[in-house]
Amino acid sequence: MQCMICQSGMQYFFSKTFTQFDLDQVDYWKCSACGFAASKTHLDMSDERWARLNNDFHSQTHYTEDNPYNRNQRYFNQALMLSLMRKQDLIPAGDWLDWGCGVGAVARLLRDYFDLRLDTYDKYFTPEVNAVTASALKPCGHQLVLNTAVFEHVRDRATLNEIESYVKPDSGCLAVHTLVPENVPANPDWMYLLPVHCAFHTNRSMQLLMDQWGYRCSVYNEHAKLWVMFREAPAAIEPKVAALNKAMGWQYLHFKPGFMDYWK
């Protein structure tokens, strides 16, 4: 199997046995070059089985009040982070898009509490606010493309490239929420191995994606658990980050040229 990030070969890593959602043994493979790991079992599924797995999992976990995967505090912190970055002129005004938005929780918070519009698109859910159809998406047309809890569900490079393709090529920003460790652990009990998670990035694989897509620096906030990547030069972004951090009175945004590898 070939790595979707760097095209190097991947080798068998470890297996985990599930007892729900029509899953049994799941085999995870790892790229020796960039550390990216993926479930070969999930990547080999038919589109129909993959859609059924996602529907079954999210129908059981997404809407219940005691849902352990429902991150309402994170959604609010993401909306807050984006609004503060807009105020600091780190993210330009214009069309904003949440690709793979679920029901549109971040967009609703931005609308209700920060007077900002975030358009929403999802292949599997019906967003509650600002929904746009696939035909209305604007290639190279958005100043911000956000995706939260999406990268770990992506089974092919074409989908990653599609998400990024909606960012304006000069001044647009890409915001990504996923878990990015230094190394993916060879541990079947690792908490991120959910039945619908099939792709696991590392600091190295994310740096390669930034290089391939032309992003030059990034910031991270640990409460929002969100990265925002910029095509502008680090020298143009860093003073604005410093100004926001000074106003907040603490290191609200962590900045770095290249990928902000916060989780070592």
Task: Please tell me what each predicted stretch does.
Residues 1-144, 148, 157-161, 240-264:
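Conserved N-terminal segment of class I S-adenosyl-L-methionine
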Residues 5, 203-264:
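Rossmann-like AdoMet/SAM-dependent catalytic core
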Residues 110-111, 167, 210:
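A generic structural signal for well-ordered alpha-helical segments
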Residues 149, 153, 197:
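Histidine-centered divalent metal-coordination motifs
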Residues 149, 178, 221:
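Active-site proximal loops enriched in glycine and acidic residues that flank catalytic Cys/His/Asp
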Residues 153-166, 178:
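A short, conserved alpha-helix within the catalytic core of class I
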Residues 167-174:
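Short glycine-dipeptide loop
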Residues 176-199, 204-211:
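Short, glycine-/aromatic-enriched active-site segment of Class I SAM-dependent methyltransferases
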